[in-house]
Amino acid sequence: MKNLLQTLRPDLKDKLSLLNEEYPFTAHRIIKDLEATDNVFDVTFLTMATMQKFLGVNLDDFYFIFEPDVERG
């Protein structure tokens, strides 16, 4: 089964790579948390808030950044 880092949208993977160059500690924290699980509901709020701040992820769309094939209802 794939972990969340593997299912992350390509544009966000690129942003995460750029973040790794400027803020390596923050990027490693996000990467570690996303690699640790395959369930989006297991991601901590701290990780979600960090992704919102540094990667521009909208918390309302958080589930959809891992499941791009799922249509919003």
PLM regions and their residue ranges:
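A short, Lys/Arg-rich alpha-helix, primarily the initiator
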Residues: M1-E22
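A generic structural signal for short
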Residues: L5, E35-T37
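Residues that mark the N-terminal boundary/hinge immediately upstream of a DNA-recognition element
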Residues: D14-L18, T47, N58
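Conserved hydrophobic/aromatic packing and binding residues within compact polymer-binding modules
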Residues: L19, Y23, A27-L34, F62
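Alpha-helical hairpin
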Residues: Y23-T26, V43, V57
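Short, basic-rich loop-to-helix N-cap that marks the start of a DNA-contacting helix
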Residues: D38-K53
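Short, charged recognition helix plus adjacent turn
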Residues: K53, L59-G73
